[in-house]
């Protein structure tokens, strides 16, 4: 049976919806990636976050190779159904660069600077 | 002069980039909307967040009619340049429904439930 969140979600033309991952207990915004109906269903059934990789064109089980998995604590759908918020428990760094989150470039008056 | 964040940003085919708004002092994720080069430049110069409304096809100065403005505290660009994180000071509710943030629908085992 299709979970109601998949019915309510407004996917884009590629069948994808943006998903924001946030560390559930600290509020740290970790990353934003994309999900399709299949990856939402898998995330809900396994409790481990699974995205859809646009570059590889296939499911992306977060941490499958790195071990940097995300346990799904809670999933939320926004008011108009076109964005998901995933409250997660992140193991290790979330970013493929090794940074704890992906938002480590701060915009300054005239440039970008890396923050820890 | 074009700000380096606009040069570094990877806009989609419609010239847009997703932007996550987060209350800077509480970590509450408020909403996700879209920005283009022009709205990024205006946000940086005025210090008030300006998005691009896809449905109306024009700049959307957040709170222009409702007064629910977002003062831009800090802007960050993610590791691969395709998502922005906006740390903001939100005045009033962020969501057009009047909810404080847009993520008020929690996914349950078999449905969606509204949370305060």
Curated annotation (Swiss-Prot), chains A, B:
Binding-site residues for Mg(2+), renumbered to this chain: 78, 80, 82
GO molecular function, one term: zinc ion binding
Catalytic activity entry: 1-(5-phospho-beta-D-ribosyl)-5'-AMP + H2O = 1-(5-phospho-beta-D-ribosyl)-5-[(5-phospho-beta-D-ribosylamino)methylideneamino]imidazole-4-carboxamide
Subcellular location, record wording: Cytoplasm
Keywords: Amino-acid biosynthesis, Cytoplasm, Histidine biosynthesis, Hydrolase, Magnesium, Metal-binding, Zinc
Domain of life: Bacteria
Catalytic EC class: hydrolase
Binding sites annotated in the UniProt record for Zn(2+): 79, 95, 102
Cofactor annotation remark: Binds 1 Mg(2+) ion per subunit. Binds 1 zinc ion per subunit.
Pfam families assigned to the protein according to its UniProt record, in alphabetical order: PRA-CH
GO BP, one annotated term: L-histidine biosynthetic process
UniProt cofactor(s): Mg(2+); Zn(2+)
Metabolic or biological pathway, per its Swiss-Prot or TrEMBL entry: Amino-acid biosynthesis; L-histidine biosynthesis; L-histidine from 5-phospho-alpha-D-ribose 1-diphosphate: step 3/9
Any one of the GO CC terms: cytoplasm
Function according to Swiss-Prot or TrEMBL: Catalyzes the hydrolysis of the adenine ring of phosphoribosyl-AMP.
Entry protein name: Phosphoribosyl-AMP cyclohydrolase
Organism: Acidiphilium cryptum (strain JF-5)
Source lineage: Bacteria, Pseudomonadati, Pseudomonadota, Alphaproteobacteria, Acetobacterales
